[in-house]
Amino acid sequence: MATILVVEDTPANRALATKLLRAAGHEVLSASTATRGIALARERLPDLVLMDLGLPDVDGWQALSEIRSDGGAVAELRVVAFTAHAMVGDRDRALAAGFDDYLSKPIDYATFADTVEDLLP
């Protein structure tokens, strides 16, 4: 069982991701803001972080930058862009920015499960 942090401001998306992850046997932490998500990442060092890009306080791009600049174990966390940004080039932009992978919404269940499992230690 892995610990996965879901940072998502939309309650329905956060609930769905949580449900899918728990059904797969994972412990789920959740945050509705980047600030809280970063704090949880630092405190708990989850095995994986699913980070929405369009968060209300700090966007996911800046949140990733803060995580990567922490150094040590926090900087090494696996972080997936989890976003409704699904235009041509968005995936490449996310990977170039340092995300470990990219999941678009609405969620494709098989892709979601495969991506999560591929990134877990």
Feature annotation, model-predicted:
Residues 39, 61-75:
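Short amphipathic alpha-helix used as the core "switch/output" element in two-component signaling
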